C-alpha cells in the first residue's frame, strides 16, 4: 500500500509538471513570388509546414492578411478617423485610396496535405477549416496561392514612400496567427502590434533586374532569368520576414569581426549631407552592437540590415526599416532604438498586443542607457538619471487625466497618446524603478538572465518577474500589480509647522493612491 501511494504521488507530480511545461508552435515557410513592378502586384506560392506542439487538437487555423487593412472602410481606416488624436501618418488617407492604390490579398487556393480547404476572409483575417484535425505533437502542410497588390505607403508597408523608396515590404504575405496557451491570436490589424510563431523562412523574390533587394536573412543566391533577378533569402529561428526594393539603393557592408557580425546599410544618395550621415552611422551602429551585446546579451545572428524605407522606424528580424532623411542625432537615435528591438520582441518574443510596454518600454530604457554610455557627447543625458526626460513626459501626461493601465490591450487604448506614453515612457520607467528597488547590479544581471533563458521563446510579464525574483530573492508581485495593472501614482506632500524656535513638526500626507 505504501509503495502504491509513492507511485501515485510520483505520477501525480510528473503529470502536474508536464501540464504546466512550456511549449510553443513552430512553422517552416517556403515562399516564392513573381513581382510585377508596373502594376505593383505579385503572384505568390506559399508552402507552410505547421507543427502543433500544444496538447490541443486543432480544427481550424487563422492567417493574417495585413494588406487588406489598406482599403476604404477597413477597421484601420475607420478607427483612424474615429480617434481624438489620429496618427498623422494615417489620418483619413486610407479612405481616399483609389482602386489601384489599395492593398489586398486574394487567396486563390489553399490546401492541407493536398486537400482543398474551406476558408473565409473577414477584413485582415483569413479563417481556414481543416480537412482533418491536427493532433498534438503532429505537423501538417499547407499550400497557398494568392494575388496581392502593394498599397500606397501609408503605415509601415507599401510602395512609393515619401522619401521615394519604391517598395517597403513589411507584413506582405499571408502569415499564420499565433496559437498559445490562451488559444488563437487572430487580431484584426489596425496598425499596432504583431505576434507570430517562431520558425524558418526560405523566400524567393522574382523582380525586375534593375532592383536592389534588402531583406531579413542571408542572401543564398541571385539568379537572372530573362528580365528579372530571383533573389533567394533564408532565415532561421525568426517570427517574421521583411524586404525592401529600390533601383537606387546604395549598399554598404561593414564587418564587425569582434561580434561575428556583418552590418548592411541600404540608402539613397538623396544629397551630400544624407550620404555623410549614413556613412557616419555605420561605425556608430557597430559601437552600439558591441555595447548592447555586453550589457543585455549577445546578438545570435551574423547579419543585421539598416534599410531606408517605411514611414518612421520599425523593427523586424535581422533588419529595420527607417526613414533616412534625418539629422544625424535623429538617424542614430532611430537606428539604435530599432536595433534594440532585436532583443525586445525579435528575440524575446512577447505578445506585444498585450505587452507593448515590454516591447517598446524595455527598448526605450535600453536605448537611453546605451546613449548615456556610448553617445552622450551627442545626447547629453543626465548621467545620474538617463531617463529624466521619460519621467517628465510621464508626469506631464498624468496631469491630463488620460492615462490608462499598461495592461490595456494595445488596440484598445482610447487615445494614441495613452498608448504611446504608456508603452514607451511608463514601460521604460518600469525598469528604471525596478533598478531602484532591487539595485542596479541585480537589474542588469537579471536582464541578461532573462535574455539567456527566454530568447527564441514567448515570455510574458510573469516569466520576467520570476527571473527577477530568482535573481534577487525579493517578492515583486506587488510592483507589477500596481505599476502595470493600475494608474495609481506615488504622490506625497510635506507640511512643516514651526511649534517654537527649537521644534518643527513635519506631516507627510499621501495624495496618490
Region spans (language model):
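Amphipathic alpha-helical substructures
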Residues: 378, 420-506
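N-terminal, polar/Ser/Thr-rich
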Residues: 15-43, 163, 476-478, 490
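Zinc-dependent metallopeptidase catalytic helix centered on the HExxH motif
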Residues: 321-387, 447
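Hydrophobic helix-coil surface modules that form long, contiguous segments used
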Residues: 176-183, 191-336, 365
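Ligand-binding face of N-terminal immunoglobulin V-set domains in extracellular IgSF glycoproteins
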Residues: 43-69, 74, 85-89
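Acidic/His/Gly-enriched intrinsically disordered linker/tail segments
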Residues: 354, 360-429, 433, 437
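Extended, low-hydrophobicity, Ser/Thr/Pro/Gly-biased non-transmembrane segments
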Residues: 85-112, 119-120, 141-248
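Asparagine-centered strand-capping/turn motif at beta-strand->loop junctions
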Residues: 50-54, 508-513
Amino acid at each position: 500500500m505504501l509503495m502504491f501511494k509513492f507511485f501515485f504521488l510520483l505520477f501525480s507530480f510528473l503529470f502536474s509538471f508536464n501540464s504546466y511545461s512550456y511549449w510553443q508552435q513552430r512553422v517552416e515557410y517556403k515562399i516564392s513570388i513573381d513581382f510585377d513592378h508596373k502594376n505593383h502586384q505579385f503572384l505568390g506560392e506559399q508552402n507552410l509546414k505547421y507543427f502543433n506542439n500544444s496538447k490541443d487538437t486543432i480544427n481550424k487555423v487563422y492567417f493574417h492578411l495585413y494588406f487588406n487593412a489598406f482599403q476604404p472602410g477597413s477597421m484601420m481606416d475607420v478607427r483612424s478617423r474615429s480617434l481624438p488624436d489620429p496618427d498623422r501618418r494615417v489620418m483619413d488617407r486610407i479612405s481616399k485610396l483609389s482602386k489601384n492604390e489599395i492593398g489586398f490579398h486574394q487567396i486563390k487556393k489553399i490546401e492541407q496535405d493536398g486537400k482543398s480547404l474551406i476558408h473565409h476572409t473577414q477584413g485582415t483575417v483569413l479563417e481556414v477549416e481543416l480537412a482533418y484535425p491536427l493532433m498534438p505533437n503532429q505537423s501538417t502542410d499547407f499550400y497557398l496561392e494568392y494575388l496581392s497588390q502593394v498599397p500606397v505607403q501609408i503605415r509601415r508597408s507599401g510602395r512609393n514612400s515619401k522619401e521615394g523608396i519604391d517598395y517597403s515590404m513589411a507584413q506582405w504575405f499571408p502569415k499564420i496567427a499565433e496559437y498559445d496557451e490562451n488559444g488563437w491570436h487572430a487580431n484584426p490589424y489596425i496598425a499596432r502590434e504583431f505576434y507570430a510563431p517562431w520558425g524558418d523562412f526560405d523566400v524567393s523574390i522574382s523582380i525586375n533586374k534593375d532592383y536592389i533587394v534588402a531583406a531579413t536573412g542571408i542572401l543564398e543566391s541571385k539568379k537572372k532569368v530573362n528580365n528579372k533577378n530571383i533573389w533567394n533569402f533564408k532565415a532561421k529561428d525568426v517570427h517574421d520576414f521583411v524586404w525592401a526594393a529600390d533601383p537606387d539603393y546604395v549598399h554598404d557592408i561593414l564587418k564587425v569581426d569582434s561580434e561575428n557580425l556583418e552590418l548592411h546599410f541600404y540608402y539613397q544618395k538623396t544629397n551630400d549631407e544624407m550620404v555623410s550621415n549614413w556613412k557616419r552611422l555605420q561605425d556608430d551602429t557597430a559601437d552600439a552592437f558591441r555595447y548592447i551585446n555586453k550589457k543585455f546579451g549577445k546578438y545570435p545572428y551574423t547579419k543585421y540590415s539598416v534599410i531606408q524605407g517605411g514611414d518612421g522606424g520599425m523593427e523586424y528580424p535581422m533588419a529595420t526599416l527607417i526613414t533616412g532623411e534625418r539629422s544625424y542625432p535623429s538617424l542614430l537615435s532611430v537606428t539604435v532604438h530599432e536595433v534594440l528591438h532585436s532583443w525586445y520582441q525579435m528575440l524575446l518574443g512577447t505578445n506585444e498586443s498585450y505587452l507593448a510596454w515590454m516591447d517598446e518600454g524595455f527598448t526605450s530604457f535600453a536605448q537611453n542607457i546605451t546613449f548615456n554610455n556610448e553617445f552622450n557627447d551627442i545626447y547629453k543625458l543626465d548621467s545620474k538619471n538617463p531617463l529624466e526626460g521619460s519621467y517628465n513626459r510621464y508626469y506631464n501626461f498624468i496631469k491630463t487625466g488620460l492615462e490608462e493601465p499598461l495592461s490595456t490591450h494595445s488596440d484598445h487604448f482610447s487615445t494614441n497618446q495613452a498608448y504611446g506614453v504608456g508603452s514607451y515612457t511608463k514601460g521604460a520607467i518600469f525598469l528604471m524603478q525596478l533598478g531602484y528597488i532591487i539595485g542596479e547590479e541585480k537589474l542588469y544581471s537579471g536582464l541578461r538572465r532573462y535574455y539567456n533563458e527566454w530568447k527564441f521563446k514567448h515570455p510574458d510579464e510573469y516569466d520576467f518577474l520570476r527571473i527577477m525574483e530568482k535573481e534577487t530573492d525579493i517578492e515583486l508581485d506587488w510592483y507589477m500589480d500596481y505599476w502595470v495593472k493600475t494608474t495609481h501614482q506615488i504622490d506625497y506632500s510635506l507640511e512643516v509647522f514651526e511649534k517654537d524656535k527649537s521644534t518643527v513638526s513635519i506631516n507627510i500626507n499621501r495624495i496618490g493612491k
